[in-house]
Amino acid sequence: MTKDTNWKIARNEAAVRAFLKGWDDRDVEACMAQVTDHMCYLNQPLEAIRGKNNVRKMIASIFAPAKKVEFKLINVFGHGNQVITERLDQWDWNGSGTWQLKLPVCGMFELTEDGKITEWREYYDNQHWSKYGGPSLVL
């Protein structure tokens, strides 16, 4: 790899980490600062959510019932304009200070040449999400 390639991968990984930190902070606008206007969120097996404003609404709808969120990063690695995350997404729905939902997730992020997230795909067990209190992800 070249120095330019290493710099780009590090920048892209930093953008994804900043996006996920926005989740930990429950800060929709911090998340949105890392994405393009035409971003696409694909949450298997649901329909794709297209456009920054629609993704903003989806994230806000998930934040609303959550008292605390933590996306625990297990692995993050990049290649070119792609970043993959292996995570444990943890959710406290009732403010008890304990995690009612611990969800293993793999996320795939595609970034533009200037380091903005343009596509975000998530892979996890949707039944586990629903069983432990996850809100509907349909707009």
Language-model segments: residues:
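Short, low-complexity N-terminal intrinsically disordered segments enriched in polar/charged residues
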Residues: 1-34, 138-139
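A beta-strand edge to alpha-helix "cap/lid" segment located at domain peripheries
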Residues: 2-11, 56-139
